[in-house]
Amino acid sequence: MANRRQPVQHRAQQRVYRQSQIRYAPGAGGESEISCCVKYSVFSFNVIFFLLGFGLLLFGVWAQIEKNTFVNMLSKASKLYLDPTWPLLIVGFLTFIIGFSGCVGSLRENTSFLTFYSTLLGLLLIAEFSAGVFAYACRDQLDNYIRNLLNDVVVGYRDDPDLQLLIDSMQETWMCCGINGADDWDRNTYFSIEAREVASPEAGGVPFSCCINSSKLEFKNYFCGHGVRLKPESHMAAHLAAQRVMAHTASIYTEGCLPKLQLWLNNNMLLVAVSMVIIAIIQVLGICFAQNLKSDILAQRAKWYYTH
């Protein structure tokens, strides 16, 4: 019985050995069908994406843990779309998966991973193209959606540290205040004029990032926006009231951030379009290289089976 098992085990070992040698065995002409240039180009290119995606993923998870969002996720489910770290997590995860499948597929010459890699890139390319067409066709609805989203961002300014940092950076960079103007901050519970009833120090004010030259100061004055939107008392003399309004108005940015965003997009439309085209070209090249490598691997396997 033992003698019968030995030939079977021997043949099984030989079969495993031969399969493991497919990618190393030269063809009938003594040369491999697999291009080392294509193989290691795909691998090197995707190592960058793998590391970039892994870094974004780690940073996003760390940011969520720092805010205890994972613990309170269900209670804050309605406001998850306002959390700026979620797009970071999604982009990081997709980049990580693409880079990982590309690295494994090219280095191990695994056709399944290369097929998954090409399919994922293709689906992503289709999604990007569809999103671009949809954004152009429904630009009016998209403008209203962005406006409503920014209004929600103003309302939730104090609810999320990352969201607060994002808004402050935007207002300081573009030298703007609110969505359409400084009065938009009246929608926020802390900055609304009605907050005077609870003696809020921020009532009728704006965030410090609305203050002119706030980003140039060595030490930020976080109280510079307090009460700048409060109307003068009725008993105050007209000229004093006018001076107070002018002084407060001169200390903050009065233009909204949405017009600034629209102006930036109009001035940099060519740059945005070129960036999108470059990203699409990189994806197409990734698909072509992966399919080329897959064809080489299949050709090498066919040649090896034919000669053995």
From Swiss-Prot:
Q: Which residues face the membrane's Extracellular side?
A: 63-86, 134-268
Which Pfam families does the protein's record reference? Tetraspanin (PF00335)
- What follows loss of this gene? Viable and fertile. In embryos, loss of protease sup-17 cell membrane localization. No effect on tsp-14 protein levels or subcellular localization. In a tsp-14 (jj95) mutant background, reduced RAD-SMAD reporter expression, a reporter system for the sma-6/daf-4 BMP-like pathway. In a tsp-14 (jj95) or tsp-14 (jj304) isoform a-specific mutant background, exhibits vulva morphogenesis defects resulting in vulvaless or protruding vulva phenotype, impaired egg-laying with severe maternal effect embryonic lethality and smaller body size.
Q: Where are the transmembrane segments?
A: 42-62, 87-107, 113-133, 269-289
Give an example GO biological process: positive regulation of egg-laying behavior
Stretches of the chain found on the membrane's Cytoplasmic side: 1-41, 108-112, 290-308
Residues carrying covalently attached carbohydrate according to the record: 213
**PANTHER family from the xrefs?**
TETRASPANIN, TETRASPANIN 26A, ISOFORM B-RELATED
What does the record give as the function of this protein?
A: Functions redundantly with tsp-14 isoform a to regulate body size, embryonic and vulva development. Functions redundantly with tsp-14 (isoforms a and b) to regulate cell fate specification in the postembryonic mesodermal M lineage and male development. May regulate BMP-like Sma/Mab signaling by mediating protease sup-17 trafficking to the cell surface.
This protein's name: Tetraspanin-12
Organism expressing this protein natively: Caenorhabditis elegans
